[in-house]
Amino acid sequence: MANGSVDMVVEAALQKQEKDRRLLRIWLRVVLFTLFCLVLVGGATRLTESGLSITEWKPIHGAIPPLSVAEWEEEFQLYKRIPQYQEINKGMSLDEFKTIFWWEWAHRLLARTIGLVFALPLAFFWLTGRVEKRLRLPLVGLLALGGFQGFVGWWMVSSGLVNRTDVSQYRLATHLTIACLIFAGCMWILRGLSHHSPDAADERTGRGFAALLTVLCLFQIYLGALVAGLNAGLSYNTWPLMDGSLVPGDLFLQQPWWINLFENPKTVQFVHRLGAYTLFAATLWHMVSMARALPGTPHARRAVLFFVLISVQAGLGITTLLMHVDIHVALAHQGMALILLGFSVAHWRGFIGEYPAPVAVEVRD
């Protein structure tokens, strides 16, 4: 094939790929927005202690809420059987029950919705040849992880139906972490489908540290889930001191000592604070190092924005403590955590660049 013909074929392939990638980017943005809403509603469900209001798992039939007085009463009677009602909410009225029911129902409905929002367009793009080969396994993997997340959600809820008045903090943290992994995976692919600046894309030090920041963000979210699961945000409501000191003296009361890291609310809050300080210092160092190594580049500018976002998140975290976990501030704190995770993934991916475009050899083959 003559070079001119090859160039025309390559140009046509590039135009088709860009059109396909534009559709995929729109779809992934919708997925990310829906995931963000799902996580926020899940946070509200936890903060309002509504997660145990629906005591059965009905993946299909459960999408329809109670429609009659008799159906509402049936749901209420099921709730009355569990320890949370018997030990905490005994005497709750039907109207009060409806309030917590709607939070959990909305969370489950959004979870079903995200499954459809992800699976149906993916099937369409796949069947119409719009999904590049390199993306097929990652996208199917994210879909499978989303399906698994549904089982994890019920596994979490079931932990609070017998012998407990709330869900296991371990299972709550697992549930949130998986949601964040799905969110991060979608962001990684979206960023890879987007145009990048070629400036210093192979700068290895910045790339490695950006990856570390992503891991730290995810770990901090995991710690935050433990805080939420144990109501540890109410352990110390002062800052920067805790019980009048930087390091309180009752952090390791339980035996063995390491169990305090997961089950002692005071220790869990302390570790979450340490994680926040570490992440703040790491992003500050990253901002300064990028300004020195790659001044004026998109990578350096993103590092500055990263530090600004971390500073806002730190302020929200402190405010959440001082306001004794006000639901609105706490939800803002959780939402900002997800925004930070997404930004950290996009920043990391920015050092790598977009997915390669087809070349003449590929087209000829």
From Swiss-Prot:
Any GO molecular function: oxidoreductase activity, acting on NAD(P)H, heme protein as acceptor
EC number of this enzyme: 1.17.99.9
Gene Ontology CC annotations of this record: plasma membrane
Domain of life: Bacteria
Chain positions recorded as heme binding sites: 272, 333
Pfam families (UniProt xref): COX15-CtaA
Gene Ontology biological-process annotations: heme A biosynthetic process
Record keywords, A-Z: Cell membrane, Heme biosynthesis, Iron, Membrane, Metal-binding, Oxidoreductase, Transmembrane, Transmembrane helix
Ranges that cross the membrane: 23-43, 109-129, 137-157, 172-192, 208-228, 274-294, 303-323, 327-347
InterPro entries named among the record's database cross-references: COX15/CtaA_fam, HemeA_Synthase_type2
Record membrane topology: Multi-pass membrane protein
Associated pathway: Porphyrin-containing compound metabolism; heme A biosynthesis; heme A from heme O: step 1/1
Cofactor(s) needed by this chain: heme b
Reactions mediated catalytically: Fe(II)-heme o + 2 A + H2O = Fe(II)-heme a + 2 AH2
Localization per Swiss-Prot or TrEMBL: Cell membrane
Subunit annotation: Interacts with CtaB.
Family to which this protein belongs: Belongs to the COX15/CtaA family. Type 2 subfamily.
Function: Catalyzes the conversion of heme O to heme A by two successive hydroxylations of the methyl group at C8. The first hydroxylation forms heme I, the second hydroxylation results in an unstable dihydroxymethyl group, which spontaneously dehydrates, resulting in the formyl group of heme A.
Protein name: Heme A synthase
Organism expressing this protein natively: Agrobacterium fabrum (strain C58 / ATCC 33970) (Agrobacterium tumefaciens (strain C58))
Gene (UniProt): ctaA
